[in-house]
Amino acid sequence: MRNAIFIAGTDTDVGKTVASKAILQALATHNIATIGYKPVAAGSDKTEFGYRNSDALHLMKAATVDMPYEDVNPYALVLPTSPHIAAKHENVTIDYALLSNKLSKHKQNAELVVVEGAGGWRVPTSDSDCLSTWVKQERLPVILVVGIKLGCLSHAILTAEAIRADGLELVGWIANRINPGTEHYAEIIEHLEGRLGTPKLGEIPYMPKAKRQELGKFIQLDHLLEPDTVA
């Protein structure tokens, strides 16, 4: 079984946290020790404990291993914008070595670490780099979350191509229905099943306040739990 997976999205607000939480909840039913890891988050609220990102808090709640917030979300940037813009406004440099150190710590404490990305695959972390550089460095297998809406076919196919062009394994994809009114839903799913060339791990239906729901039942874990054969 893989010891870490990266959850990528076709865009921002397509359901990476919903899918990550669903995976964590499904793994919990198999008594697998898990940690949710949100290396970089943009959009955090001030609390008595410091700035906290709501997506990172959802991951903490769904995981089975307790870790300090600072380990789960090393960069809780305040502004809800692209990480490189938020970091620049806060005089922060996103250090990949720090992200790797936290990931190594998580791997020592859990059987599987679910690493949630930010934005889309090429989300910038500085004026000259993207978070995907760090994912490549760590050789993380990737699950792609597709927010089912008009335009998602091109976004999904392009993102899958970019992930593979970076030399990474696309181990599966998850459909997240973000708009109940999307027409031709079944045809969109059928096309993605034929084009992405990797197993569909689940379909998450539209539901209000999805992040607060029990989502594990929508995920099929068989492929995810197979032995890791990629060097």
UniProtKB/Swiss-Prot annotation:
The keyword Lyase does not apply. It is an enzyme of class 6 (ligase). Homodimer. InterPro entries: DTB_synth_BioD, P-loop_NTPase. This is ATP-dependent dethiobiotin synthetase BioD. It catalyses: (7R,8S)-7,8-diammoniononanoate + CO2 + ATP = (4R,5S)-dethiobiotin + ADP + phosphate + 3 H(+). Pathway: Cofactor biosynthesis; biotin biosynthesis; biotin from 7,8-diaminononanoate: step 1/2. Its cofactor is Mg(2+). GO terms for biological process: biotin biosynthetic process. GO terms for cellular component: cytosol. The active site is at residue 38. Catalyzes a mechanistically unusual reaction, the ATP-dependent insertion of CO2 between the N7 and N8 nitrogen atoms of 7,8-diaminopelargonic acid (DAPA, also called 7,8-diammoniononanoate) to form a ureido ring.
